[in-house]
């Protein structure tokens, strides 16, 4: 999982889901797990 300042580019990928857990924003992508990231 990558830590990124901006998740905007990852949100646009096919299969991407934006999830908020305990105030932290994650992008999870089951189609292409390379694009898994958390905002930091």
Swiss-Prot record:
Keywords: Ribonucleoprotein, Ribosomal protein. InterPro entries: Ribosomal_bL36, Ribosomal_bL36_sp, Ribosomal_L36_bact. It comes from the Bacteria. GO terms for biological process: translation. Transmembrane segments: none annotated. GO terms for cellular component: ribonucleoprotein complex; ribosome. It holds the Pfam family Ribosomal_L36. One of its GO terms (molecular function) is structural constituent of ribosome. Belongs to the bacterial ribosomal protein bL36 family. HAMAP family: Ribosomal_bL36 (MF_00251). This is Large ribosomal subunit protein bL36B. It comes from Streptomyces coelicolor (strain ATCC BAA-471 / A3(2) / M145).
